[in-house]
Amino acid sequence: MSPLAQVLALPVRAYRLLLSPWVGHGCRYQPTCSVYALDALERHGALKGGWLAARRILSCHPWGGSGYDPVPGADPEHDRRPRG
């Protein structure tokens, strides 16, 4: 992971350590948004990974999506499926 990606991962790790135990396990997606963010930063670096993580976190609300949504490149079988 690049140094900038490591810096961007710090708030996610802090959330997982400090807030997640109190908030509970109510993520709409699988993998959870925090796991997705760390995986996106690891696979795609700070810029693209940060964009993917931000987009995912912003879509996590009652009117957003839900279900299985892995980071692009993490599940080639899922990546090949047509969207829609």
From Swiss-Prot:
Record's bilayer topology term:
Peripheral membrane protein
Q: Where is the composition biased (Basic and acidic residues)?
A: 75-84
Ranges where the record places region Disordered: 63-84
* Localization per Swiss-Prot or TrEMBL: Cell inner membrane
GO terms for cellular component: plasma membrane
Keywords attached to this Swiss-Prot or TrEMBL record, sorted alphabetically, are: Cell inner membrane, Cell membrane, Membrane
**Principal subcellular localisation of the protein:** membrane
Asked whether the UniProt record includes Transport among its keywords, one would answer: no
Q: Which PANTHER family match?
A: MEMBRANE PROTEIN INSERTION EFFICIENCY FACTOR-RELATED
Q: Which family does it belong to?
A: Belongs to the UPF0161 family.
| General function of this protein | Could be involved in insertion of integral membrane proteins into the membrane.
Q: What is this protein called?
A: Putative membrane protein insertion efficiency factor
